[in-house]
Amino acid sequence: MGSAPQQWPLSSGLVMQAPHICPDASHDTPAQAAAAVAPPDFKWPDGGVSRVPFRVFSDPAIYALEQEKIFRGPLWHYLCLETEVSQRGDIKTTWLGQTPIIVTRDQDGAVHAMVNRCAHKGALVCLKDRDNKPSLTCVYHAWNYGLDGQLKTVAFQDGIRGKGGMPADFDPARHRLEPLRVQVYCGMVFGTMSAQTPPLHDFLGDRTRSFMERNMGQPLKILGVHSQIIHNNWKLYAENVRDSYHATLLHTFYTTFKVNRLDMDGGIVLSDKKWHHISYSKRATLQVADEYQEAKVHAAQYGSDLEGPELLKTWEGFDDGITHSIQTVFPTLVMQLTLNSLAVRFVVPRGVDKTELFWIFLGYESDTPEQQKMRVMQGNLTGAAGLVALEDGCINSFVQRGTVGSPTHTAFIEMGGRLAESNESSRATEAAVRGFWHGYRDIMGF
C-alpha cells in the first residue's frame, strides 16, 4: 500500500520525481539485519587501508553486521533537509540503513526523528514521502502517536461495552515510537540511534564543519529530487565519490570541457579522524599537463565545443577560487558544488549488491531568478543521466560483477601512497578512499 510519488517543480518547467519511500518487495527489511550478533569469521588482509578485501562487497554476513555497527551504531547520519520539515506538522520519511525513519516538526517547532514502526505490530506508520498532519496514525489498528512519537490513543483501549480491551496495567508511555537523537546543522537534519554517539560538532570536526558552512550555510531551497537504483554494494559508491583519481579519466566530459582536471590547482583534505573528506579544484588555474597526452586519456586527444556553451557559464559565489568540490561525511552523505550546481546526495543500502542513490538539487533562498535558472541547467551535469555522473551508475556495477567470485582477493589502493592523509598539492591520490576504509575498519572492528 502506498501513495503516488510527489512531484517537485523546477524553475525551468521541468519536473523531477521525488523518491517514493514506501518500500516494495525489492527492499530489504530491518528483520533481515537481525542475524548480525557477532563479527563473521573474517580477517582484514595485511597492507592496512591500501588493501581492501573484495569479500566486503558481497558477503551477506558483513552486510548484516554493517546494519548494526554502522547504521545503528555510534555515528551521525543525514536524514533529510530541514526545509523538508520547515512547517509545524510536517512529516518526512526516509531510511537509516535498512531501518525506516520518520522526521517531524511538532507544533512547538521542535524537530524529532523516530523509527517508522508501530509499537503494536511493527507496521509502517507513515506511508507517504512527505505529509503534514497533527499526529501519526497507524493504518493497521489506528494506534495514534504525537509528532514527538509518544503514543496518544489506542483504539478500543477500554474494550467495547466494558468487555475486551487492554489490560488494566497497560501504560501508553511505555509504547512510544522508538526515538533517535537529532541535531540540525547547516540546513540538514542528522540522527543517530546510539546513545554513545559523540556530539555532532565533535563527530564532524573543524575542517568538515568549516567547508559545510561554506556551501550549505545559507537558507536552502529544493530545485529537484530524484533517485536511482545502482547494482552494487553501497560501499563501492562511498569509494567512488572519494576517488579523485578516477574523476578526469572516467568522466570524459570533465576533461574535454575543462570543468575539472588534475592539472588544475586543488587538493584533498581529510578530517582529523580521516573519515570525512573534501576534494576541490580551481578551474581558472588550468595549466594543461603533458601527462594527459602521455597517458593517452581519450578525452584529452581532441578539442570540442558545446552547441550550448551557456551550460558552463558561472558566477563566482565565493572568493576562494574553488569551482568544483565534493565533500563527504562518513558513511553515506555527499555534498557537491560543480560550477554552480549545488546538491546533496546520499545512499541507502537495498541489499548486499543493490543501493538506492538519492540526489537533491539545491539553490539558496537568496538566488536571483537568473541564478536559479543556471543552477537548474547545470543540474544536467550530475544525477542519474548526468553528462558527468552517468558513468558512475555503471562503473560500480562493473566492480561488483568483477569481484563477486573472488572473495579472497583484494583491491590495490596505493595511488598517492599507502596512508590516509591530506594532500593540498595534488588530487592524483586515493587518500580519501583510504580514509573511508580507515573509518570503516574502526567502526566495524576489523
Predicted features and spans:
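C-terminal catalytic domain of Rieske-type non-heme iron oxygenases
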Residues: 8-22, 105, 110, 180-446
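N-terminal pre-ligand scaffold of iron-sulfur
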Residues: 2, 6-128, 181-184
